[in-house]
Amino acid sequence: MKVVSSLKSLKKRDKDCQIVKRRGKIFVINKKNKRFRAKQG
């Protein structure tokens, strides 16, 4: 999982990426291709 300061460019890497907020942190998840996961922080 990548840790980045801005998730906007990582959301555009794949059409199935979606942004979710869990436990106060913002994540990019992709259920079809797990290697596109990222976390902001």
Curated annotation (Swiss-Prot):
One of its GO terms (biological process) is translation. The keyword Cell membrane does not apply. GO terms for cellular component: ribonucleoprotein complex; ribosome. Disulfide bonds: none annotated. Keywords: Ribonucleoprotein, Ribosomal protein. GO terms for molecular function: structural constituent of ribosome. Belongs to the bacterial ribosomal protein bL36 family. NCBIfam families: PRK00831.1. This is Large ribosomal subunit protein bL36. It comes from Rickettsia prowazekii (strain Madrid E).
